[in-house]
């Protein structure tokens, strides 16, 4: 009974915490040979959207640290709201944003950067598989944590339920160990990595701060029998990792 009460309380805390975040993340992936310039130009475009569209969604950039990709990303409460916003933006706002952008950067701003669209991605937030320590204000913490480690997980056929149950157990174990960090779990709706069933987004104030924190967490975990039992019976395989920096 005590475990049921604790689990219910944790679920309520999770729902309240993640109610602050939109449910869907839509990300357009671009590759470029001049990441610094392309990022600057995309940031100009982002800022103009936020400045000129009073209904603009949460909009940010993710820049790959060890590669040449930039992700132009927005978050929406539903796919219907995305479709409504996108239609209104293209019909009524985009021409004004484009005119201002060209005024700032010229007609052929991306010339020489070899910037090419790769594909669009749609992800759904999974609050039940995410972790934000109790008492932490997520919206206040997000701008402080500019580093993102994205881990794509492949789950075998018929093992989704087992993976999700394992993820929940690992979160509860970290709570027991007083490991405090932020992990957001996303589930691909469209796009994503081939064979990727989930994407874990683990936050840090910087890459160095993230790995220092991870080292401390692993010391506690490796001394804990429950954690070691889960470690020795993994569900799912990490198939891709990216280190990115976020720009709001």
Regions found by a protein language model. Name each.
Residues 6-11:
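Sec-dependent N-terminal signal peptides
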Residues 1-4:
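Positively charged n-region of N-terminal signal peptides that target proteins for export
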Residues 14-17:
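N-terminal signal peptide c-region/cleavage motif recognized by signal peptidases
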Residues 19-248:
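Short S/T/G/P-rich N-terminal loop/turn motif that feeds into the first structured element of a domain
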């Amino acid at each position: 009974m005590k475990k049921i009460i604790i689990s219910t309380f944790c679920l309520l805390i999770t729902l309240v915490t993640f109610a602050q975040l939109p449910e869907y993340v839509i990300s357009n992936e671009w590759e470029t040979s001049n990441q610094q310039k392309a990022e600057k130009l995309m940031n100009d475009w982002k800022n103009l959207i936020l400045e000129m569209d009073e209904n603009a969604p949460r909009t940010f950039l993710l820049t790959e640290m060890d590669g040449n990709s930039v992700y132009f990303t927005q978050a929406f409460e539903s796919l219907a709201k995305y479709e409504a916003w996108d239609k209104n933006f293209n019909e009524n706002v985009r021409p004004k944003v484009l005119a201002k952008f060209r005024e700032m950067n010229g007609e052929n701003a991306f010339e020489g950067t070899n910037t090419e669209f790769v594909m669009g991605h749609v992800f759904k937030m999974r609050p039940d598989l995410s972790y934000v320590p109790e008492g932490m204000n997520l919206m206040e913490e997000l701008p402080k944590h500019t580093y993102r480690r994205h881990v794509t997980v492949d789950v075998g056929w018929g093992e989704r339920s087992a993976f999700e149950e394992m993820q929940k157990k690992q979160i509860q174990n970290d709570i027991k160990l007083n490991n405090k960090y932020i992990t957001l779990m996303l589930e691909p709706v469209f796009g994503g990595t081939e064979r990727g069933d989930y994407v874990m987004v683990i936050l840090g104030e910087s890459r160095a701060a993230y790995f220092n924190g991870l080292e401390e967490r692993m010391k506690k975990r490796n001394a804990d029998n429950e954690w070691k039992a889960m470690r020795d019976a993994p569900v799912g395989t990490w198939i891709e990792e990216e280190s990115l920096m976020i720009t709001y």
